[in-house]
């Protein structure tokens, strides 16, 4: 291993991607039926039409916060892969302890 650091296999240079997929507004991937199913699980019978966009917005903010904290843990330990434990710790510091994923 000559100067590749920890973990790297040294295959390729990782140059410019020729066909990079353009990431659009992925929050729309959280579909109306998916939101309805989550609401049903929470015991909701009827749902206002305005709820769907509001739910997408709240979910986006929540995930941004969790992912930011998880990536902070990953960078601190000098890794490039976010593990399940990083997410568990990120949720724990937000006061939402998650069981069943190790630790």
Swiss-Prot record:
Keyword annotations: Acetylation, Chromosome, DNA-binding, Methylation, Nucleosome core, Nucleus
Q: Where is this region: Disordered?
A: 1-20
Q: Mind listing where the DNA-binding region sits, in residue ranges?
A: 17-21
Give the sites modified to N6-acetyl-N6-methyllysine. 6, 13
Cellular component per GO, a single term: nucleus
* UniProt xrefs under Pfam families: TAF
Q: Where in the cell is it found?
A: Nucleus; Chromosome
Which residue intervals are annotated with compositional bias (Gly residues) in the record?
Answer: 1-14
In which domain of life is the source organism classified?
Eukaryota
GO molecular function annotation: DNA binding; protein heterodimerization activity; structural constituent of chromatin
* Alphabetized Gene3D superfamilies for the sequence: Histone, subunit A
Write out the function statement from the record: Core component of nucleosome. Nucleosomes wrap and compact DNA into chromatin, limiting DNA accessibility to the cellular machineries which require DNA as a template. Histones thereby play a central role in transcription regulation, DNA repair, DNA replication and chromosomal stability. DNA accessibility is regulated via a complex set of post-translational modifications of histones, also called histone code, and nucleosome remodeling.
Quaternary arrangement and interactors, per the entry?
Answer: The nucleosome is a histone octamer containing two molecules each of H2A, H2B, H3 and H4 assembled in one H3-H4 heterotetramer and two H2A-H2B heterodimers. The octamer wraps approximately 147 bp of DNA.
Q: Which family does it belong to?
A: Belongs to the histone H4 family.
UniProt name for this protein: Histone H4
Source organism (scientific name)? Apis mellifera (Honeybee)
């Amino acid at each position: 291993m000559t100067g590749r650091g920890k973990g790297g296999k040294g295959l390729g240079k990782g140059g410019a991607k020729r066909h990079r997929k353009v990431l659009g507004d992925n929050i729309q991937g959280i579909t109306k039926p998916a939101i309805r199913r989550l609401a049903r699980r929470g015991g909701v019978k009827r749902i206002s039409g305005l709820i769907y966009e509001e739910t997408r917005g709240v979910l986006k903010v929540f995930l941004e916060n969790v992912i930011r904290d998880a990536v902070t843990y990953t960078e601190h330990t000098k890794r490039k892969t976010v593990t399940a434990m990083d997410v568990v710790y990120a949720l724990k510091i937000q006061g939402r302890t998650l069981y069943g994923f190790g630790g």
